[in-house]
Amino acid sequence: QSPELSAVSATTMVIASNSVAKTTLAGQVTLSVQDIDFTSPAAMQLILNDLMGEYMIASDNLAADNLLTAATSSGVWDGTVADLLKSVYDSAVDISNGRNWTPTHMFVSPDVWGQLGQLADTTGRPVFPFIGAGLTGQNALGNATASSWNGNPLGLQLVVDSNFAAKTMIITRVGAGSGDAFEFYESIRGLQSLQTPSTLGRVMSFHGFVSTFAAIPGMIRKITQA
């Protein structure tokens, strides 16, 4: 406002109407009454757990595929420590430009997780060492251990998923509550069961509805490898 008491600018908020595609994920198994009656309840629970587990794998795979599809390249990593620094910060710059948001997560496939854990400095010390009680890591850009996927390379929360294609590395912002680049929605509908008297059987199924949305595609950056 200038001068004082002059009219201030009026801004109208515009809320976008985005269409989000919904995907139905489901699986089923058919059992005879003999299988049901002659099998222990514990064994039946294994069947139900398997249905739920397969649904969870399919849901995760859909999210992983859609996240990678939405990503835009921020460069190529040659496998060295120095180039990793450049690639990650190039991605962070691409995310921050014109938005003032910073990345929060690094999503990688298991092979890339292995590459990160094996990176060493010129003296052979791990760049991402395991830091135990009372020990201080040297040259620690983050920390990692071969017994866990947890880590924070360059301050980013590491997420490792075997449903990603090999050589996948994605830098983005999620879970912050504001400025999230990628969103995931899920409605688990659960187990359904239907008797089929004509064949003395029972059909059991498990299903749910899943959606993903690339809210800010420019903030989903991938780093490829040669």
Regions found by a protein language model. Give the residues of each.
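Short, contiguous, pocket-lining structural segments
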Residues: 17-21, 39-47, 64, 80
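Protruding loop/beta-arch "assembly-hinge" segments enriched in small, turn-prone residues
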Residues: 13, 60, 68, 187-226
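Long amphipathic alpha-helical segments
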Residues: 43, 47-67
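Short helix/loop capping segments that flank catalytic or ligand/cofactor-binding pockets
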Residues: 1-2, 8-11, 39-40, 115-118, ...
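Assembly/oligomerization interface modules of large self-assembling protein complexes
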Residues: 1-25
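Extended, low-charge hydrophobic alpha-helical regions
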Residues: 19-38, 116, 120-124
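Extended oligomerization regions of viral-like shell subunits
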Residues: 75-208
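Short, highly charged C-terminal tails/helix-capping segments
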Residues: 67-76
